[in-house]
Structure formats: structure tokens, C-alpha cells
């Protein structure tokens, strides 16, 4: 088994904790997982207990973050991964940040109309071509020991069974409610309950996301890059005013 140390930048969303919680030192002999959400960290730790290495655990954690903090992490975005190979000390960096579609120009957001309508923040023009899935898949293939299906299992379980919404998450849904309603059919949004943000403590279930992860596990990243999932992304982006193609 190839030994690695890994640090994944997955879009941290944190809130203030009591001073006593921050002061406590925690030690572990064989491995430790830290992320923006305890359920995502638990997913990574589960993979370690099943014999996975650090990269396997990192990908499992990132997949679970897609479920528990969908506003900040996941398949529609991108990121970086820094890996240190324990055997050689070599440091490897994977860059899978999202990129601008081929139709974008350097002055796309420079016009007065773009500034007034906030093209860089809202709508299809603000959406980059996602690199996250390709990054996760590449990390697993090159440095992991487990399959996508294996590391995605905790995230799929979370998406299907649901988890209790945090009060901050309810606030984020409320803050983004106007944009969510503008670009989506409210009836399809799992974040709403009769048109209102899910209240803190309510279960958030995302069966469509679980189905997506299962499809990727079965068919590979090609379902997004050139496949039916990619077609759906392109259609949604362009419907919202963007200009993305499947070639992107």
C-alpha cells in the first residue's frame, strides 16, 4: 500500500466554537481527519478504518462535504490537493480548479451591464467548467487504493438517509433563496420545505445527489465530461444566461 500524507482544500465553512472546544488537544496514532463538518470527517475516518490510505479518506471526506455543505463544496466546483508521499518525501500538487468556458473573454465582466446585473456572481455567466470530479478521480487513480464506489459509500448514505440541518445552514439557504428560486423549480429543491428554507434540526435528504454519485461510480467521470450529466450542466448554465458547451 502506498503511504501518503494529504491535505485537501475543500472550501472551509466554519463558525465560532466555545473557547473550551478550541483549547482541547486531540491525538491519534494511526490517522486523523479534519474538515468543515463532523459528518464529513467521520466519512473520511470510516474509510481509514476500512484500510484506505490518506488520499482515499480525503476523497471520501470531500464527497461527504458535497452532501453536508452543498453551498460551498462539491461536484460543480474545483479545488487543489497537496499530497506528501511518505516513502520519498515528494510533494505533489493537483490543480483541478474550475476554468472559464471557451466563450469567455477577458472583458466579460467589465461592461456596465455586467456590473449592474452582477454577471460575475449570479447567473450562467458566473459558472466555470467544473474540475472537481476529474481531480477526485485522478487522485484516487494515482495515489489511492480504493475505488470511487468504496469511498463514495459514506456520502451516498448521508445523502439518502439525510442529516440534521445546522442553524447556519438555514440562514445560508435563506440568504440564497431568491437565486435558488430564480434558476430552479422550487419543487425540485431539497433545501426547501413548502417553499421555505429547511428549519434547523430538520433532515436534509438529497436522493438525486446519491443517484449522481452512484452513476459516477458505475460509469466513471465521463458521465460529466462529455456525457449525460455534462449535457444537463450545459443546459442549466445556458438556460441561466451562460454560454458553455460540452466541448468545454
What label would you give each PLM region?
Residues 22-42, 46, 54-55, 59-226, ...:
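Noncatalytic scaffold domains of N-terminal-nucleophile
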Residues 7-16:
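Bacterial N-terminal signal peptides
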Residues 1-4:
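Positively charged n-region of N-terminal signal peptides that target proteins for export
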